[in-house]
Structure formats: structure tokens, C-alpha cells
Amino acid sequence: MTLDRAVNPPRSSGRKALRRAVSGKTVLVTGASFGLGEAVARELAAAGATVLLVARTAERLEALAAELNSNGGRAFSYPADLTDEVAAAELAKTITERHGALDVIVNNAGKSMRRSLHLQYDRFHDFERTIGINYLGPIRLLLGLLPPMREAGRGQIINISTVGVRIAPGPRWGAYQASKGAFDVWLRSVTPELRADGLTVTTAYMALMYTRMSAPTPIMRVLPGLYPEEAAQIVARAIVRRPRALAPWWVWPADVMSTALPGPTAAFMRVWARATRDTEAASAGGRR
């Protein structure tokens, strides 16, 4: 087993199983223009799903949809800013009118942010942006898409989360982890209601992925992680097996340790905070 497999959630390369699970089904993927969302869209289209691509970047979405369709897939692009309440409501209405109750929703759109507290004194918008994209945005969309799914008594929601909401929060990640944690708690809270109506909810707690969001942080380049195409296999596993959660094996003991040994955990975080620095982009963005 390679190191990247050991520190990330289990993934599957069972193409036949994925095809059986999604062929002829309609799957919506947010954040589909880059990174994991794009990789998931490609994987699902190749497996026979009708893929609805959602992101803010219209040109990227349209190009991806055209490529998938030219390769024999079936894809539709829906450019939208989910932080806009009106746009999110209109998107949900349009998708429901055109496609009916969805079979799978992959909540992947997100905004990462790593910045020290002293650089955020005059950047309250950092928190507004992360909350808007990572918490309120997906709720806005789901509130519009869930009614027909619950009425149909079927469907699956897959939330792409982070191990950071399951273990002791790391320094400089406050805005990001708080927003991801907020959605995680909300989704776990409504899951019993959704399951009562026949829906399945799966959360994939991802460790490090090599994407545009992680690229600016130097230490992320040397830690073991997954490329988007590899991480897409975790989503494929979630669709095929429909578990409640997917997480690296070490998340549970790390969570227990942080609770049972708060002193050593806090000491480690202080060492980590001193050993790491803000990126140039974060530092420049924090100076006003």
C-alpha cells in the first residue's frame, strides 16, 4: 500500500460497478469546472450518467460539457453563483423543470483559505466568502432540489468535506474549517429526515488533494495526497457502496486522542503554528 492510499479515504476503481450504479441516472456535480469536480464529472459521464455541471466559470463548464458530449457522454452546463440566493433558487427551479428528481448530488464546490488571525483583522469578508460558498451556498441549492427527491423517495447526497472537521482544528484554517464544519453539522442534523424519505447521505472526509486550492501552500506539496483523478475514485466508491461516511483510517483515533489528550494536542498545534508560515498570497492579501 502506498502512503497516499494509507492516509486518504478508501477508493475504488471498479468501473463496471460504477456503470451499474449510474448508467441512465442523473447526477449533479457542483464545482465542476476544475479539480475534483471536473474529474468526478468525467468519471460519471464515462460510466453512462447524465451529468449536470454547476460552477461559476461558464466558459470552462461549456467546454467540459462539449467535450463530454463529443466523447459519447451526456452533459449539461449550468453556470451559477451559489452564493447568490436568487441565482441558486432559479438554478434549482430550472434543473427540476428540465430533469425532475435527481439521482445523485455531489456537493463539491468550495473555497479553501489559510491565513493567520492577525492578517484577518480587516478582512471580515474572508469569513463571509467561506461561509457563503462552503455553508450557505450548498444549503440554498439543496433546499430547492430536495423536495422532488423526497417526494420520489430516492436519491443520494454526497458531501465532499475535509478531515479538518473531524480532528483538532489546525492553526490558520479557522475560516475554512468553521464553514466546512457548519455544513457538516447541518447535513448530519437533517440526515435522519432524509433517510426516512428514502434518501442516502454520504460524507467523504478528504485529506490532502493536490488542486488549485492547495497549490499556494508550500508544505502541501510535500505531504502525501491525491490528485483529482484519484480522489474521484473515492466519490465513485461512495456512489456504489452508499456508506454513511468515508474517511481515512486514522481520523477516528486522532479524534479520540484530541479529546482524551487535550494538553498534548494543544502543544502540538502550537508547534505546528510556529513551524509553518503564511503564503506570500495570504500575507499580501492581509495587508491593507
Q: PLM features: residue spans?
A:
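Conserved glycine-rich cofactor-binding loop
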Residues: 26, 31-34
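Conserved glycine-rich Rossmann-like NAD(P)H-binding loop of the short-chain dehydrogenase/reductase
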Residues: 49-64
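Conserved mid-core segment of classical short-chain dehydrogenase/reductases
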Residues: 112-128, 172
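Active-site helix of classical SDR
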Residues: 142, 179
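Residue(s) in the substrate-gating loop at a strand-loop-helix junction
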Residues: 162
